[in-house]
Amino acid sequence: MECCLSEEAKEQKRINQEIEKQLRRDKRDARRELKLLLLGTGESGKSTFIKQMRIIHGSGYSDEDKRGYIKLVFQNIFMAMQSMIKAMDMLKISYGQGEHSELADLVMSIDYETVTTFEDPYLNAIKTLWDDAGIQECYDRRREYQLTDSAKYYLSDLARIEQADYLPTEQDILRARVPTTGILEYPFDLDGIVFRMVDVGGQRSERRKWIHCFENVTSIIFLVALSEYDQILFESDNENRMEESKALFRTIITYPWFQNSSVILFLNKKDLLEEKIMYSHLVDYFPEYDGPKQDHAAAKQFVLKKYLACNPDPERQCYSHFTTATDTENIKLVFCAVKDTIMQNALKEFNLG
């Protein structure tokens, strides 16, 4: 009988060891997929960052994929010009030549979301308007209304885009703007580990959908548009965009769901800040700024400190990087550093080292 029990005990022990081993294996396999949640207010660059991951770590964009963006580029051009035409009226700016108001009426007669081609008379109207002194003044005052960052990029390159055989470049695709509604996921494999990036809509109306994404988040990547220090919200005419972004970051970093997730700050659109800081002074929007004017390095550090001050836990590290999401080389370098941070934290958290 004792012999029998001993054999049973041995078998039970062996089974327990197998179960333990399998549990360890399952835990390890579960961690072979790392979930990265991209957060930030609308137009901070989250979708552009995911496109970069597809270019750098995925299959990129085939000619067929690129053809799928032609309509979107055309729509972005119409949308940008229509935004400026509306602003001309709001800001009471006159056209350089009076008859150009008729061209403006022509461009406004089209619903930009239905645009599928780019030809005369609309092509000529948009080219003529972009050269108009009044529209240029309106463009210079773009912080006073809503205009996409890519407006100048496309409108300055119409000679290429108007060609019959036009095929969008990767840069055209990176710059193409379509507001994210709902949740987009992009998984990619890196060194045998699946990085699952989740991009959620940034506009206020989209944020209630985030709750479904909160489970098992390895890292939060929070994007800040540095260039928004002097801009107002898309959803509200009197709120500073950066203040809204900062309030959101403060909420995110204190959520109980994310206590074990590493936090990475991407201070994005540094190229736009460097351009803008020369004529739009930080102190006019943040009176507590006491650094030099027209100094982009001082401005970047000031904004970084503002965000880091939102973290109530001195023990919790926030990793930060200054980025230009439309610059593939910059994102390649930054994500290389970020990958190491994410991996180290995941190993530490789940004792897989």
Curated annotation (Swiss-Prot):
Residues 264-271 are annotated as: G4 motif. InterPro entries: Gprotein_alpha_Q, Gprotein_alpha_su, GproteinA_insert, P-loop_NTPase. Residues 172-180 are annotated as: G2 motif. Residues 35-48 are annotated as: G1 motif. Residues 32-353 form the G-alpha domain. Its main location: other. The keyword Transport does not apply. GO terms for molecular function: G protein activity; G protein-coupled receptor binding; G-protein beta/gamma-subunit complex binding; GTP binding; GTPase activity; metal ion binding; phospholipase activator activity. SMART domains: G_alpha (SM00275). Keywords: Cell projection, GTP-binding, Lipoprotein, Magnesium, Metal-binding, Nucleotide-binding, Palmitate, Sensory transduction, Transducer, Vision. Residues 323-328 are annotated as: G5 motif. Gene3D superfamilies: GI Alpha 1, domain 2-like, P-loop containing nucleotide triphosphate hydrolases. It is found in: Cell projection, Axon; Cell projection, Rhabdomere. Belongs to the G-alpha family. G(q) subfamily. Guanine nucleotide-binding proteins (G proteins) are involved as modulators or transducers in various transmembrane signaling systems. Could be the transducin analog, an amplifier and one of the transducers of a visual impulse that performs the coupling between opsin and cGMP-phosphodiesterase. Could mediate a subset of olfactory and gustatory responses. This is G protein alpha q subunit.
